[in-house]
Amino acid sequence: MNVLVVNAGSSSLKYQLLDTDTREVFAKGNCERIGSDMGIFGHSENGGAKQTEEVPFPDHRSAIARVLEELEKTDFTIDGIGHRIVQGGWHFDDSAVVDDEVMAKILEVAPLAPLHNYGEAAAIEYCREKYPELPNVAVFDTSFHMTMPEVAYTYALPKDVCDKYHVRKYGAHGTSHRYEWMMAKEILGSRCHRLLSCHLGNGASLAAIEDGVCRDTTMGLTPLDGLMMGTRCGSIDPATVCYLQREGGYSYQEVDDMMNKQSGLLAISGISNDARDIRTRASEGDERCLLAFDMFAYKAMQQAGSMIASMAGVDTIIFTAGIGENDWSIRKAFCDCFEWLGVRIDNNKNREAVGNGPQVISAAGSAVTVMVIPTDEEYMIAHDVERLTKNN
């Protein structure tokens, strides 16, 4: 089945057309700077070089329109369209074929992710209008985490407030965590029972997965909670917000921007939110970059402990996403903290596990299997399109 996967961000849109049977990618590209006077459109086919051009993208409708216009010039067919949706809220515990009711629910929960859901909804609506005969499937970052028990997702705030405003832990990166479980189970079989999935990138989260069911995750009501990230602070004392507004005179929006866009690795290193830049400077002795590296690993280790406790142990640890897949030193620092659990990694395998597909990096005799599995959210979304539409 040929599926067009659409991933609409707050000011960008990425797409990929792939075959769910062979995983062959026919075309892919991106639209950047949506909402500005002039955007950038990039497109490539069959693994060829990306061609770019400047195109005005006043909104997400204009961006997806340009994508479909480009694909219509090719001989590729589209059998279905899958859309990544950041927030499914309390409505969705699985992906869903889009109809008017599903669209209404996506917009109803949009206040929980206003920078994403509205743009994603606009892209879906355009696709439905353009190709009414094609199925559109919404795949939610949050749905995988809806299996968390009440004790894990409930916040210790007044119940009437939580009920009125739907305040609870929702998590994120669910499509990636679900893919990691699927791949680990395929490779390890019955040896994979309690899995710690470590999605470590510019955005980062952990998930405790027991027999395919999410027991807990580190992101919360929004993707700001949990681990220290590229530009996000992660978990801090909530009173910090009140303190900064009271003593510093910061507005709500200024604090929101600070914690989401000016914090994390960028704030501590003082130079970049890119782990590669920080690693280079740290190796040269830059003290702020060394601290940023150590804090990132420490925060991940610290919260991994709570994820492991929620499963009463761990059999498998998976690293994925930009940092998890490519930074052997972060993996080593993380795993060394769990030697007391019997985690042992093979240093040579760990160093070599960069961009080479799924690989086991744990040493012989390790009580826990440790792997690097490159994530593939696009395939997972396409897989859901096929799963939900093939019998219709």
Q: Which residues fall in each region the model found?
A:
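Adenine-nucleotide phosphate-binding core of ATP-dependent small-molecule kinases
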Residues: D257, G264-I268, A275-S310
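Catalytic phosphate/nucleotide-handling subdomain of diverse soluble enzymes
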Residues: E210, D216-S251, D257, A321-A353
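Glycine-rich beta-strand-to-loop/alpha-helix junction loops that act as flexible
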Residues: A8-G9, R84-G88, L200-N202, V314, ...
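Short glycine-rich, Thr/Ser-proximal phosphate-binding strand/loop in the N-terminal lobe
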Residues: V3, S12-F57
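Internal helix-turn-beta structural module
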Residues: L290, D294-D315, G324-N392
